[in-house]
């Protein structure tokens, strides 16, 4: 039988000789070739079982890491291009892969678990999967077990996400020092497609009876990712004006903007609460080990004006502010090692006793998603998976982008890259680039 179970005379994709467990194991191994992986566990197996049929697990496990065309999938699966297209279209309709249009037609890419297909599954109400069961499994995997969250947020120096400061609280001095890519409004202005979806985090918590009352339809995606999700009904298309109105709504609800940790080509901005969203929960759970990259700002309290009302303490989404007593005096203290620099506390101080200052340390942001992926892969010892993808012929453009990112690395990272790849070709490239 083929992908959807219909018998055909022509060559089709069969699964009778492989057990379901092996299929999901192969899929798990494929997922973990990418820096943003998912540590094995019985819970992960159950999650994959909800999201993928056995046939889908087998097929997706064979797909390359880099973007690919339908002819690549057809060759891997040994089927016709029309059959491969039908399968890929079905996978895209479930947001298990993304379909992206360019000047050569349609290409496909398998997103990582997060930010990726884990979230997509809960970004709209669905009846084709058991979302309550899935939410319970997610809660077990991310909130009870620790391996996934530690791997996602703490296994690399380079972070997957970064925080955007609340622009409405910036002073004139702040406005001078903030860069365009540090502004959520700039990301919105530069986007060609904008999609709005249900907040995966709060939707998940809703199914386990732990959701807060923060806005639900406020998750933002951009450009090719947004267009794919819109076309497959996982997001609704909005214009820049409406997106900025939603951003303002997020500010008013003390939500923290967490987006992709890149300067160009940001694909998502989540509006995170402190009770439901993984990054904020992790920030509270693991102390000063930042799960996402901070902003370049840090709040500073003017203690002469502060009335110690505690509104900033209540508003802080990661419990980085507290009331302390020293030498018989009580005052408000910000834990700067924990603080993300989001600006929520500034917004909630009606006495104007808190203002944002520039951090002393320089915040380094990867240029784009390829640069970030290369850095994360080097730090996890997985760079070879990005370069040598045995499941398909490498795309020259993707290879060129990866090598270009490597050539721009600092010397220490270049050495790590060279050691991991053990490539004479890469060594030659690096030596030529350093001259």
Per-range role (PLM):
Residues 66-77:
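Short acidic, hydrophobic short linear motifs in intrinsically disordered regions
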Residues 77-93:
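Short amphipathic alpha-helical interaction segments
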Residues 92-103, 321-322, 354-355:
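A short, conserved structural fragment
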Residues 95, 254, 310, 319, ...:
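Glycine-centered, phosphate/nucleic-acid-interacting loop/turn motifs that mediate DNA/RNA or nucleotide
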Residues 336-435:
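Flanking helices and flexible, charged tails adjoining ferredoxin-like Fe-S electron-transfer domains
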């Amino acid at each position: 039988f083929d992908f959807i179970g219909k018998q055909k005379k022509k060559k089709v994709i069969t699964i009778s000789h492989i057990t379901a467990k092996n299929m999901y194991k192969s899929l798990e191994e494929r997922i973990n070739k990418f820096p943003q992986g998912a540590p094995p566990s019985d819970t992960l197996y159950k999650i994959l079982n909800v999201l993928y049929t056995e046939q889908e697990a087998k097929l997706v496990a064979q797909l390359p890491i880099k973007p690919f065309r339908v002819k690549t999938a057809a060759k891997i699966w040994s089927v016709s291009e029309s059959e491969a297209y039908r399968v890929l279209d079905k996978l895209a309709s479930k947001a298990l892969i993304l379909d992206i249009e360019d000047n050569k037609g349609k290409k496909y890419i398998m997103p990582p678990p997060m930010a990726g297909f884990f979230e997509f599954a809960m970004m709209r109400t669905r009846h084709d999967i058991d979302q309550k069961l899935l939410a319970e499994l997610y809660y077990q995997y991310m909130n009870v077990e620790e391996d996934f969250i530690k791997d996602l947020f703490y296994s690399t120096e380079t972070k997957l996400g970064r925080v955007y400061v609340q622009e409405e609280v910036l002073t004139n001095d702040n406005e001078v020092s903030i860069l365009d890519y540090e502004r959520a409004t700039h990301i919105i202005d530069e986007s060609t497609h904008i999609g709005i979806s249900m907040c995966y985090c709060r939707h998940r918590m809703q199914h386990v009876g732990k959701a807060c009352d923060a806005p639900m339809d406020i998750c933002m995606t951009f450009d090719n990712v947004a267009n794919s999700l819109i076309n497959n009904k996982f997001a609704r298309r909005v214009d820049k004006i409406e997106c900025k109105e939603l951003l303002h709504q997020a500010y008013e609800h003390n939500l923290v903007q967490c987006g992709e940790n890149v300067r160009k080509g940001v694909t998502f901005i989540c509006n995170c609460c402190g009770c439901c969203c993984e990054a904020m929960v992790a920030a509270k759970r693991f102390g000063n080990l930042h799960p996402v990259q901070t902003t370049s700002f840090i709040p500073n309290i003017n203690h002469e004006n502060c009335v110690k009302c505690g509104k900033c303490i209540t508003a802080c989404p990661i419990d980085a502010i507290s009331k302390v007593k020293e030498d018989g005096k009580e005052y408000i203290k910000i834990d700067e090692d924990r603080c993300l620099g989001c600006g929520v506390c500034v917004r909630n101080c009606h006495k104007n006793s808190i203002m944002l200052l520039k951090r002393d340390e320089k915040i380094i942001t990867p240029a784009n998603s390829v640069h970030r992926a290369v850095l994360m892969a080097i730090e996890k010892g997985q760079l070879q998976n990005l370069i040598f993808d045995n499941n398909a012929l490498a795309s020259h453009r993707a290879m060129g982008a990866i090598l270009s990112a490597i050539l721009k690395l600092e010397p220490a990272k270049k050495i790590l890259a060279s050691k991991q790849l053990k490539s004479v070709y890469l060594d030659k490239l690096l030596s030529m680039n350093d001259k």
